[in-house]
Each structure stands twice: as C-alpha cells, then as structure tokens.
A protein has these predicted regions:
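Non-catalytic, usually N-terminal nucleic-acid engagement modules in DNA/RNA processing proteins
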Residues: 17
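OB-fold nucleic-acid-binding modules
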Residues: 1-13
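Glutamate identity and glutamate-enriched acidic tracts
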Residues: 6-9, 34, 67
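OB-fold single-stranded nucleic acid-binding module
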Residues: 22-32, 43-89
Length: 90
C-alpha cells in the first residue's frame, strides 16, 4: 500500500484506506456519483466513484476501512482519486 502523500497524477493505486466522509452527489447531467474523502496517517485525498452501481463497488459507510483500486487524477489544481473498486474491509 502507498501512502496518500506519495501519490502523483497518473498513478494507479490499490490499498486500504479510511473512508473519512461519503456523500452522494449528482453531476450536471443528472448522473449520480459518490464523493468520498480517504484518509491515512499522512493525510487526506478527495475521491470519486463515478458509477456507484457498478460491479466491484460494495456498500460501505463513512468511517469504514475500504479496499480501493483506482487512478490518481488532478482536477482544478487538486489531486483526486477516481475509484474503480471500493470494498468494505472487515
């Protein structure tokens, strides 16, 4: 697992992180997505689940540890993670 402060745009990651916050949202086109904040001991990073109903996205809540796979991108000058798989980690 890589720490959040080590990530750079273009990185592909796989690891277990704390879901600090989870909030449903809607794009300008009316498509639902999940806006989450991931945290580890080095800091926090914004994350997006653009297709929350896709295979591999399990139901999880804020303050759950989740297994995450995705790509690091930059939007409006800030790093964010586009999450492809998010599974609750027990």
């Amino acid at each position: 697992m890589r720490f959040l402060n080590e990530l750079h745009e273009g990185d592909r990651i796989s690891g277990i992180y704390l879901c600090k916050q989870k909030q449903p949202a809607v794009t300008k086109n009316g498509k639902p997505y999940e806006n989450i904040i991931l945290q580890d001991k080095t800091g926090m990073m914004d994350g997006k689940i653009w297709d929350p109903n896709s295979l591999g996205i399990d139901d999880f809540d804020a303050l759950d540890y989740i297994e995450v796979m995705g790509d690091v991108t930059s939007f409006a000058g800030a790093m964010q993670l586009n999450i492809k798989i998010g599974r609750a980690h027990v």
